Design a protein with these regions (language model features):
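A short, well-structured beta->alpha microelement
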Residues: 7, 14-68
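Output/docking surface of receiver
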Residues: 57, 74-117
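Acidic, contiguous N-terminal accessory segments
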Residues: 1-9
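Short amphipathic alpha-helical segments, especially helix-boundary/capping motifs
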Residues: 1, 39, 80-81
Length: 117
């Protein structure tokens, strides 16, 4: 009997075309390291468990708060060139760099997410 592990869907809010290309390439090139995840680049993060949020884009935090209010099990990750010094959400600063992205708190987020299941 084989078990297929459910991939964790990663969505996005307001990411730039450059961010989307970078992240899609990371998921494609780092399939082994990111095998627990599936990235959905659409602007509809309703099904996502983890949401990458463009902190530099006006209005995305309001969208995130509405989304998180409807489903508090979702985990957000702020991406931006200027990030708050203190944030309840994990942060990833621009410019996005492969090593930083893979070694970011995403693994910790997955652990936290799986512990809550």
């Amino acid at each position: 009997m084989s078990f297929v592990s459910e991939k964790i869907l990663v969505g996005q809010l307001g990411l730039t075309a450059r961010d989307l290309t970078f992240i899609k390439n990371i998921f494609r090139l780092s399939a082994q390291q990111l095998s627990k995840f599936r990235f959905d680049e659409s602007e509809d993060p309703n099904q996502a468990r983890i949401v990458l949020i463009n902190n530099d884009e006006p209005g995305t935090m309001a969208k995130w708060h509405g989304l998180h209010h409807r489903d508090s099990s979702k985990q957000g990750v702020l991406i931006g060139s200027s990030l708050p010094l203190r944030s309840a959400l994990p942060t990833l600063s621009r410019p996005l760099i492969l090593k930083r992205f893979i070694q970011s708190r995403i693994e910790q987020i997955v652990s936290d997410f799986q512990a809550r299941r």
